Amino acid sequence: MKDRGMTLAWCFLFSFIVLLVLRGIFFKGAYSQASPPPEGVLDMHCHTAGFGAGGSGARVSQALRKSWKFKLYLKIFGTSEEEINEKGDEIVMDVIVRQVEKSRFIDDVVILAMDAPYDGEGNLVEDQIEAYVPNRFVGEAVKTKKGLHFGASVHPNRKDALEELEWSKENGAIFVKWLPNIQGIDPSDEKFRDYYLKMVELNLPLLTHVGDEDSFSRTDNTLGDPKLLKLPLECGVRIIAAHVASSGEREGVENIERLLEMMPNFSNLYADISTLTQMNRSKYLHQVLNDERLKGRLMYGTDYPLTNTPLVTALQFPLRLTIREIVDIVLTKNSWDRDVKLKAALGCPKEVFELSRSFLGLAS
């Protein structure tokens, strides 16, 4: 037994040395020139959640609530169904406030509402609701919580869409957020022209999911095509394409390429880097951080709480990060600080961390 133990120990040591040698040979370093991240960063892509506890009006579909994803989402939000039932949906935002207060790099975040789907006649489609987080709930809650801003969500098919845009602006909305794939929004629909012109009038940018979506039980990924954004861009809406369209394809071309093709033609088209360090999207990091068409167009966001999943880990970048960087990032408890450190170490430049605040006109 002693000889066997010694043999295993030597095998482990030999394997470890071989791995270190191979890592030394194949180590590539950051995707772009790495530099220390700045402090005072704004996360412009942060979700909250709820299912109506405390009279919030929020809802999730029965299919999603029965899914394994539901309990996982609550866990990575840092709460539970029992706690939300006891304290109300607003507890999710309270958890966010506490985490932001403890962050070294993040000063504030934009909390996103999520409107329900509406049909072409302007009627709410109850059986297609995946997740609904009302504007009134988010807009009022953030007024009393330090470090939180209001990201509205207004479906353009609503009969009161223009009035809802005005209410949102009057109540502090920073921008409008869409997830077309589950809300049933075709951005290219000509009947939305007045809606887009109202957004321009109110100086409300649009943060919209672009690319495929797989976090919900029902989705129409044809609505995530970047090319559908041409109409609002032509109307003058400033658009932030979430995730740089880093998932899916249309007509045999990856969505990210379809988005990049549009960048030279529309100076009002931007993108955020949320979820780019997820295992299923990280293959695009080199392209995103080095493509000239994205220079000055990228801004920082997390898609919180997805930064709290195993899909976002420094351990997946052994040939890009030093061992010291990996250990430091893995041992960082605050999810926002962990995300900032990871993206900075991989080569995300200072101006990306700073653009979200300057673009949205928010003082630090």
Model-derived features with residue positions:
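Short, flexible/disordered intra-domain loops and linkers
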Residues: A58-V60, F77-E86, Y118-E130, S215-L223, ...
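H/E-rich (His + Asp/Glu) clusters that bind or coordinate divalent metals
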Residues: G24-A30, A245-S364
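N-terminal Sec-pathway targeting helices
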Residues: M1-F16
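Hydrophobic faces of well-ordered beta-strands that scaffold small-molecule active sites
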Residues: L42-C46, V109-I111, H149-A152, V176-W178, ...
